Amino acid sequence: RTIALALAQNGWDVVVHYARSAAEAQATVADIIALGQGAIALQCDLNDEAAVKTLLDRAAAQLGPISCVVNNASLFDYDSATDFSTATLDAHMHTNLVAPILLAQALHRATPEGAQAVVVNLLDQKLFNLNPDFLSYTLSKAALQSATTMLAQALAPKVRVVGVAPGITLVSGDQSEAEFQRAHKVTPLGRSSTPDDIAHAVRFVIEAQAMTGTTLLVDGGQHLIPLQRDVMFVTS
């Protein structure tokens, strides 16, 4: 929501994708329209390959040509090496890797010769500071980071592909607000990322026409502090 509103404030018309949160998506659309920009909400199950492949065409049919895709949707379920299953990995890979690749492919196909579009993939600071928690999620995001580089190579010059890697930003799982606040401060800067920080970074990489195939860390330096567990488990 924060990213969508920030882009609207910067003059973008916005397609708000949702899987199940229709009311929240429509509320975001209403707020964007109130800012004077065009907006629609489109439902799509990111595990449905056929639906993902048509999502950009559906968006363009209602709002006009698409020149930017922000892959922010993410599956974030807990597992570890001791309870790993192929079903859990497959679910994470479909949402966190396959869907972003298909959307980048569709954007490249829709971008005319001589024009340039951009894909922004939301990653995670833990790729630069590994721990054993959230195994399937981490593997899927690590694959997306590699895909960010490979897509940037393959889809240039029509499409730039850039990663943004935030730190802990919102309450995760069964964290209490107090636990989140403690975890949020475990950085060299004394704070991790906020939704506004991430939105600002996304706006920056969209406008930075010389950036592609790289990842911008926006985490207050969280990746510089090694932890044995995921930062969401920090309680003291």
Q: Where are each of the predicted segments found?
A:
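Canonical Rossmann dinucleotide-binding motif of NAD(H)/NADP(H)-dependent dehydrogenases/reductases
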Residues: 1-15
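Conserved Rossmann-fold SDR core element
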Residues: 7, 145, 155-169, 211-218
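The beta1-alpha1 cofactor-binding region of Rossmann-like NAD(H)/NADP(H)-dependent oxidoreductases
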Residues: 22, 43-55, 86, 196-197
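Catalytic loop of short-chain dehydrogenase/reductase
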Residues: 75, 112, 116-156, 168-169, ...
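Substrate-binding pocket helix/loop in short-chain dehydrogenase/reductase
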Residues: 80-81, 85-93, 183
